[in-house]
Design a protein with these regions (language model features):
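A short acidic, helix-capping loop that chelates divalent metal ions and anchors anionic groups
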Residues: 44, 49, 81-86, 115-120, ...
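Short glycine- and Lys/Arg-enriched binding-loop motifs that mark or flank ligand-binding interfaces
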Residues: 34, 73, 81, 144, ...
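Short glycine-rich anion-binding loops that position phosphate/pyrophosphate groups of nucleotides
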Residues: 39, 80, 151
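Active-site neighborhood of HAD-like aspartate-dependent phosphohydrolases
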Residues: 3-74
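A short alpha-helix capping/helix-coil boundary motif
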Residues: 40-43, 76-78, 108-110, 131-134
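Proline-centered helix-kink/hinge sites
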Residues: 50, 57, 113, 125-127
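Asp-based, Mg2+/Mn2+-dependent phosphohydrolase catalytic module
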Residues: 1-25, 30, 90-108, 117-146, ...
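Substrate-recognition element of Asp-dependent hydrolases with the DxDx(T/V) motif
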Residues: 59, 63-96, 105-118, 157
Length: 205
């Protein structure tokens, strides 16, 4: 995982992985971007401790199913703990490294370090993280899927023109679940749907 040059001052932090596979043009989605906390790993508020990183059930299998089909995977994550003075960039990056140790490499990380009052264009549900990740991967937002556990994740997908898939957890609000255009029981189910298989069909391998 290497730090990529910022697109502009005050924008998101970008981290480029790779080399990463590129899906053939007819394959949809061309890339899948995941929220981090509550989606790929258990949500530990403002976590700066790699030892507290715990993958969500089925996360590795779901990611490997996409990687095995040549579909790049990335992460789009709000980390307002930086703006609040609760996290350093070094802590954020240490947690990212631990996530990759447990779940494998990601083609791109797009991280918003700003707070809710900062007025940035990257904090979800704004589209900036999704758009920046798509540019880094060289894919069109409309050919990209975003998987997350709350309405802000799907809001960012919608604002960017991407497809959103909600994987609810106990903290997901009922109104967010009701409003989601696409829902999945868990990460393997989300991947099955994105690959065009029946929901809860054969196991993701």
């Amino acid at each position: 995982m290497t730090v990529a040059a910022p697109e502009r001052a005050g924008g998101p932090w970008l981290y480029a992985g790779g080399p990463y596979p590129t899906a053939p043009a007819p394959v949809r989605p061309a890339a899948v971007l995941f929220d981090r906390d509550g989606t790929l790993v258990a949500d530990v508020p403002y976590n700066g401790d790699p030892a507290r990183v715990a993958p969500m059930p089925g996360a590795r299998a779901a990611l490997d199913a996409l990687r095995g089909r040549g579909i790049p995977v990335g992460v789009v994550s709000n980390q307002s703990g930086v703006a609040r003075g609760l996290l350093t960039r070094g802590q954020v990056e240490a947690v990212q490294r631990r996530v990759e140790e447990l779940l494998g490499p990601f083609a791109v990380w797009a991280v918003c370090p700003h707070g809710p009052a900062d007025g940035c264009g990257c904090r979800k549900p704004a589209p900036g993280l999704v758009l920046a990740a798509c540019r880094r991967l060289g894919v069109a937002p409309e050919d990209t899927a975003v998987v997350g556990d709350i309405g802000a994740d799907l809001g960012a997908a919608r604002a960017a023109g991407a497809r959103g898939v909600l994987v609810p957890t106990p903290v997901t609000r009922p109104e967010e679940i009701a409003a989601a255009p696409c829902r999945a029981a868990d990460l393997p189910d989300a991947v099955r749907q994105l690959l065009g298989r029946p929901s809860s069909a054969e196991p993701v391998r």
